[in-house]
Amino acid sequence: MGPLIELGVPEVLAATVARAANFGIAASTWKTYSTAVRHISACSEDTGRNMSIPFSLADTLTFIGWLKLKRKVRSKTIKVYMAGLRMAHLCQGFNKVELGGDLVSHVLTGLEQEDRLRDKQMGKRDRMPVTLNIMKSLRINLRKMQWTLGRKRLVWAVATMAFAGSFRVHELLSHVKNRFDPTSTLLMQDISNSVGEGDSKKKVLKVFLKSPKEAKGKEGVVVDLFETDSYLCPVLAMEKYLRSLTFTASKASPVFRTSQGQGYTGVAFNSDLKVVLRNVIDWDKSKLTSHSFRAGLATELAGLGYSDQDIMALGRWRSDAYLHYVKTARTKRMKVVEEVTRKVLRGRKK
């Protein structure tokens, strides 16, 4: 609040403005800001340089060099910390933030090119999308795992939902296993079942996302997942998972939990994927994570000739495209999903 008063905001209004500014920042941004502040202190201690805000050009370049040399982070991560650094300046009242201009941009571009060259030399590739073939392999290998039925159904329910709904991993899963944020975590009260409209009697799983990226500042969005006549049906997978729970799940608890009742996290899901797909994916050369599911359906749709607009709508990559899509009648959307499922499974061109 102090920096706002220094800018000339009346003291009686400063608290209101500060509170509004805080609500305008996502929790992940606050986390990045906190991490950046800690790194500034560590960098200052390691280099013996007084890294005080506001940063000079030399401070910014020192910070970038320290992150690369000492923290061994990639260019993409450095850019994230730079965003946190800008936030640190804003929080201290420096609203006209200029962290180096063209020279810093040139250095960051060079680090990005260096990372790409190193990845190429090491045979590493970009993140793989989860394609239909990978989903088939995941299902087959899950059946062979010496896991409890509940654990298998948990992994498969997450996988089918992530694939069918192009969800971001933490739209479905907890960040940590022992606690959760009810304002962003998918809870039991956020999912419900209904029956299709018109002549369709197929089930619809309604998933309410409280804080999706494509609806910032709005009251969330509902993603409809439709029952399909295939092994990829997310509705059936969810029903089986819920039946396998060994405890009573309250409405205010996370949807996806382990048999011990702990939150199933994105890290845990990634770990399970590596185990189940160990004979399918060359993990030394390929990068497949929980986020790969988000690109999976889009990849299949592109291969079938769907337009960019359709893909952006179904995958929620563009807020205007998706919000236009969800305003269409549910019967029409169900037909779209049925058509997509049929073509994806049969591999026929549109």
Model-derived segments and spans:
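Extended, non-catalytic subsegments within catalytic or DNA/protein-binding/adaptor domains
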Residues: 1-350
